[in-house]
């Protein structure tokens, strides 16, 4: 090999540096079409939260929030300016926007603001009963709000005192507070001098500092509990079953606007309670929206924030959009092609962000080919598409690409990563034969366009020989019930439940009970050796239970976030599989929709795609919900939902930013520039250089995206981020590294393929002019013609190079190493 080609002369670098420095992008004018009607109903200008009130016991109360929506969509809290009128003043009263009980019965509270009015029904029970303080319902929430359970929840506690992390063990916490060191932490004779109070109020030295005031409602509740003898709760005490935060969405102005929210818990006995003062509040973006201890939001700079409230085992949140006060904004007349654009635009209008325009035809074609098939269009395909005047040509091209085998290859690769299809060090952990059968089965299912929920159902319920029924390899590649439970939740729901194995999830709804209930579906999976050493028989053993770490009690199977099904005499996996594939499962459709969106848009609506949780909210919840509903409506037809996404204007926008969306990277106002994944990049290099690769177990010329085994790789693939499938993950490793840069510049892959393919020799044999050869190379690599400026710079190079083949070789090398080739844009 002539190694000079691996390092093009400095003149080439000087001439071409400006050409290849960035990614070429372009924009077309916005189409002036009428905007479709919004999918969601316009919100009421005047709203009162909550819409109904239920009060139980003498000390119960419910705060009201009154919200006005101005013409520009900004929300105002007008609670303090509103008038409250109780229909029957003997039943209830309102003080500073808080409804208080007086007598049993029912009445209404009329809320009036200017010419607006709304009536809130109120129901009161046991108004004369002073309910005793509950350890679980009143005291533990105080510990949680003050974050006692965070510091003292460490494995060894803190300063000699230990609580359960995030309150997963109420019984143990009560013991440690009241009886572990008798008389040390509580003083029943003089409750105010109890250590749990003096340390929290700053009256005694405390590593955690002062947590609340001595005369606060929290202190008074603790004193009442101690005065009653610090009792534990009865076994049948009501427990929280859900939590809501109101309002669920806010658009506020910056800086300094305030808005108070309210939080309400519902309990297993049917009651509800205002827990705003007991909830722990958090914000995802303090620079845009700060949150006070009792739910007071104060805006900062422009941006988005997700304000969360945690109470008991539940965490809920509200989306807060903050825009500059007095911002002048006019929404342009732009085309909305489907529900995707309508919902993207709704969010952008709230943010006062204008979407970028459409990309040009060359950019669209290249983007669609890479995303849908993992290939590049040929030069002839580019020229034909650009010359086509059919207004429906983009939609038709998408349909053609969806019917190509390469579309199946891409999704077989992604699902192989989710299912961790890989060989192990021995036959017990996945033989090559089993892995190949597993991959081929998966690819066959996708090629037949079998509904995704049915594929999931067949995998979860798989039994028999892993060689005769390849889906049974789902239980061969992973045998630990704990890992099976975690991997299933992550692969099919996009939920990471790992935290809940040892303690209640700090920032999501999942408890240790939820974790063990989900795990119980996998504790009765039996395995035995088949006749072939590589064969394993998967069956229902009928024995094996999931036990709670606290108390070692058996936890029956329970759907995540759902009911406890009847599994008596049934294969538990079949029960789970039926539920996963059913409309009652709220997770699968949204997760698959998010996977699709992330692949084609470069970022998930929930990002990372396999980390769905309250504290990592969707950037556009309405869009995610609509995509999930469409997927169910389409019977989990993968092609149909991909078609919806790719036909949207949102997918076809340019990557070029405007003044309003320059800093936005999560609301899809412009296309995302992203590097090709490792397998696709290698395949595209081979395609444009007309060379063939040989991968283990595949014929020469097979593409890297077709490799079945996660353990099969090359130096190039490993360097550019090919996954080994050791963990559940479909996120593509596309971050730059020094090894990648060095391999492209000095490695043998690009240089060797240029020499091996003979493209330059072929082009020069056709009596083409230098400009025609350069244009052909550009069409191959960038899928566009070179600009006049680029041609002038190239002429400066080949004009001073004695050997034209060497000049073309160097230009080809530079194109393949350019960002515009390596990135999809």
Go through each PLM region and give its residues.
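Solvent-exposed helix-loop boundary motif
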Residues: 37-59, 67, 80-81, 85-102, ...
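Periplasmic/extracellular electron-transfer cofactor-ligation site
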Residues: 144-165, 224, 228-235, 496-511, ...
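Structural motif
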Residues: 71-76, 267-273
